[in-house]
Amino acid sequence: MRLVIAEKPSVAAALAAALGVKNKKDGYMEGGGYLISWCVGHLVELAEAAAYGEQYKKWSYDSLPILPQPWQYTVFKDRQKQFRILKDLMRRSDVSEVVNACDAGREGELIFRLVYHAAGCDKPFSRLWISSMEKSAIKKGFAELKPGEAYDALYASALCRAKADWIIGINATRLFSVLHGKTLNVGRVQTPTLKMLADRDAAITSFKKETYHIVRLDVGGAEAASARISDAADAEALKMACEASQAVCVSVRRERKTEQPPRLFDLTGLQREANRIYGYTAKQTLDLAQALYEKRLLTYPRTDSNYLTDDMGDTAVHIAALLVGKLPFMEGAAFTPDIARTLDSKKVSDHHAIIPTMELAKADLAALPESERNILTLAGARLLFAAAEPHIFDAVTAVFSCADTEFTAKGKTVLCDGWKELERRYRATLKGKPDAEGDEENELILDAPTFAEGQSFDSPAARVTAHDTQPPKPHTEASLLSAMERAGSADTDPDAERRGLGTPATRAAVIEKLVKSGFVQRKGKQLIPTKNGNNLVCVLPDTLTSPQLTAEWENALTQIARGAAEPEDFMRGIEEMARELVKAYPFLSENQKDLFKEEKAVIGKCPRCGGNVCEGRKNYYCEKKDCAFVMWKNDRFFEERKTAFTPKIAAALLAGGRAKVKKLYSPKTGKTYDGSIVLADTGGKYVNYRIELARDKELTQQA
């Protein structure tokens, strides 16, 4: 019997369908000589710091650095049942072989190996390595299973990555949290990402607007523009001089240019475009692509490749033909795909680029949720663009001299519209969504006029236009994903498995964590660092805020995965880094002590002592330590009346002793009514309230 372990239930179901395994059990499927079960993402993780001793349960400077030896592992509490199922299956006497069918990559290898070792399994295992959930790809993968030990070095690199992230993340987070008296999450990927947002925010804040002017001449129906002129009076003087002069063409340059089709999507590219066009967050796009993958309509989404493997040519041609018939914007388009330019096995790592699958033939796109349909269409459109002809045009630049000043006119003559025609067709269906990117502020891109050297225009009409220099734009998820992808790439081995900050699969989670931690806030599509976010990057050392650390790690991990470096050497360097970090920050400077001090929201005066009453997470309390006045947000009085004890109600009670509230619930009648909540404080341990109705009928209850 062969036990197959997938990364998630949906993948296990697809494997079972391809292998004809139909008998469903509790946590697995059985049939035809196969047992098919699954993890639920990570089932086993590195244990928390507290597992290594009582001294680590409380955060303190004296307990740092924490350097586990030996390492301990734990099963996620909410996934214990599935782990026990896998453990029991591995121990079955009729199971002779285990197949690692977790995602083909470094993280998938780690997920399987941790479960395998935690279960105490020593049976031989093999590796399934596929990029598509189509039946043909699954069957081919099972026919070409690799020995598990062939991926030992990959597992070693994955485990080193996890341990290194643990050591630096745990120690840096505890160190700076203890120093500043506030939980400050620090991570190898999220902290440099936050730094990029903070740097952009600082550039915007320090930006000083400058006005400049451009003089524009009418030369035979085309427009020639001057360089930028700072002074408005100088621009006006030039305009008048030009209108009294002759504009002479001094040079004409015609250049044949080719704009190649865009490459196929990797996950980051898909997330960028979906954010720009539809406003989807990176996490939303990943979730939608994953849902389509599990429906077998899209290939594996967590990829950093922009190409297909060389053997996928025929499949891609068939898929392109399906797309032409399925996508409305292709109706009437003359299109013959050139798939060859999308094929390059040497540029495919774990998984090929994201494209629709042959299941498209049977799919009813109209039946899909709109958001899933948008992502599938986006991926399909990109395959068609990538397989279309290049966009070829002649770029014409004509230079004129007038009033001893140079003016430039630009134009283009399109010779072959190519993939741009398909892109225009697609964008026309987007109904108000953004057009193609580009900024043509100072050049008029039209059909190129015909100019000749020596051609002149007497007293040309002229005008002056005023412009303001623009500050950098706040990062959107689209621009931040691009920045994360490029960060540190110049210092990273071209053959490294991961380049930039994070992986295609984890970048969305990094952004979400920054938002959830309160270091970043969303304003529409924009990502803006909060005050705490800006302060955090200011207090951390460059080693933690620069992508250089990730570049160095990835280079080392790549060598480990190749078997060219020892994991022990890498880990010794990580431990030394943690020791040096703790040693460098024994205390805070005076100007840093109050950086993260919470500003208390004062909502009124205490009725007992006259001190300030502030809002806490669970209550409203008097800030004077010797005063016991406190109003609890979850007070039974409010809960029974199904009324949220809001700051507005609390402020009214403190200001006037009463607050008018609508739709109070009556536990006796089950109906709602309007009335006033009256503060009836007697100075005891608990604060009392009562209801006052319009007809002066009162109901008193102690909280």
What spans do the regions from the language model cover?
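Metal- or metallocofactor-binding catalytic centers and their adjacent structured scaffolds
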Residues: 233-265, 271, 548
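Conserved ATP-binding/catalytic motifs of P-loop helicase motor domains
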Residues: 124, 194, 298
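Conserved short loop/turn motifs at secondary-structure junctions
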Residues: 1-3, 101-104, 181-183, 254-263, ...
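Intrinsically disordered, low-complexity regulatory segments
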Residues: 1-162, 166, 460, 470-471
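C-terminal or mid-to-C-terminal helical accessory/interaction module adjacent to the motor/catalytic core
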Residues: 135-219, 254-258
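Amphipathic alpha-helical transducer elements in NTP-driven molecular machines
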Residues: 9-16, 33-36, 40, 76-87, ...
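Basic, low-complexity terminal or inter-domain segments flanking catalytic cores
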Residues: 2-3, 90, 118, 173, ...
